[in-house]
Amino acid sequence: MAEEDVAALVVDNGSGMCKAGFAGDDAPRAVFPSIVGRPRHQGVMVGMGQKDSYVGDEAQSKRGILTLKYPIEHGIVTNWDDMEKIWHHTFYNELRVAPEEHPVLLTEAPLNPKANREKMTQIMFETFNSPAMYVAIQAVLSLYASGRTTGIVLDSGDGVTHTVPIYEGYALPHAILRLDLAGRDLTDYLMKILTERGYSFTTTAEREIVRDIKEKLCYVALDFEQEMNTASASSSLEKSYELPDGQVITIGNERFRCPEAMFHASFLGMESVGIHETTYNSIMKCDVDIRKDLYANTVLSGGTTMFPGIADRMQKEITALAPPTMKIKIIAPPERKYSVWIGGSILASLSTFQQMWISKQEYDESGPSIVHRKCF
């Protein structure tokens, strides 16, 4: 089989959403929730040809009769049976390809346990008969997508946030920090503070509404105290939002109180430091000679970095922590919600990358541990 003629598949499995498509494309073809649902009661839908499981949007729309599970928690796969269902759905239903005909590039969280990388490799070759595969670290792909090979990536999605310093294309594992504060926590926090205003959001269906409010109306304040004063003095920051049933709600200081939790985890009752300090701590764990390059190339990535105002606030906070004369640059590409996938698309279509694939033959000779020798 001539590899050149066949487009590689790129699959970015996030805690919240799975992004999938073809190498060389500029955006993923398929984006769907990383969920698997199973019927709560057998045989409720008699004659409906009821399936034993549903994946993605279909699971989401039938959630009333299903028990929903997220097989990826905090960026790490915890349920392999469900993960296999998500991959099956990706290949056969979303991309409509035969996985045995295409090389596949998968992404993994930073500090993904070795056993997990081996399991991913094994499933691709043994269950899906992939001709070739590769596993790449998510944050590294985001950095490539921004046209860099050195920098620090703040990657924040639905389930986890990481700060990943990268030098000449290699992540520096000793300096990677993980923060279990991400999009899902912000949605939960917004549900909580909207309840204090007298609106009740409790069910999973209502959580989706709150997530939409968060994505459409929230922003990061440059100066939190000052913004709070502005909000209490006038209604200039208030916005209205129409719920699916036609009811209109008003949201004021919640708009910036919600994402402020990223800088003050104590809002969520968490002990950890905010994203700015985590980024700084990550830089400080690196060799003193490369810090300058990291400060000047701080790249934001992932859906939870999409809040308006976040780059300016990061610039302000990191400047306050860094040495006085240090040049600090925060890069926030407009497409950063999908930059991991885009980086994968770029990498998998490079002519120089074609020798990097793990082939089925290499897997058959060496077994799953081949992944540690070829993907780093």
Swiss-Prot record:
GO cellular component annotations of the record: cytoplasm; cytoskeleton
Keyword vocabulary terms for this entry: ATP-binding, Cytoplasm, Cytoskeleton, Hydrolase, Nucleotide-binding
Enzyme class, UniProt record, top EC level: hydrolase
E.C. code: 3.6.4.-
Signal sequence annotation: none
Localisation: Cytoplasm, Cytoskeleton
Keyword field contains tRNA processing: no
SMART domains linked: ACTIN
An MF annotation (GO) of this entry: ATP binding
Catalytic activity of the protein: ATP + H2O = ADP + phosphate + H(+)
InterPro entries referenced in this protein's UniProt entry, alphabetically: Actin (IPR004000), Actin/actin-like_CS (IPR020902), Actin_CS (IPR004001), ATPase_NBD (IPR043129)
Keyword Hydrolase carried by entry: yes
Family to which this protein belongs: Belongs to the actin family.
Function of the molecule: Actins are highly conserved proteins that are involved in various types of cell motility and are ubiquitously expressed in all eukaryotic cells.
Protein name, as recorded: Actin-2
Protein's gene: ACT2
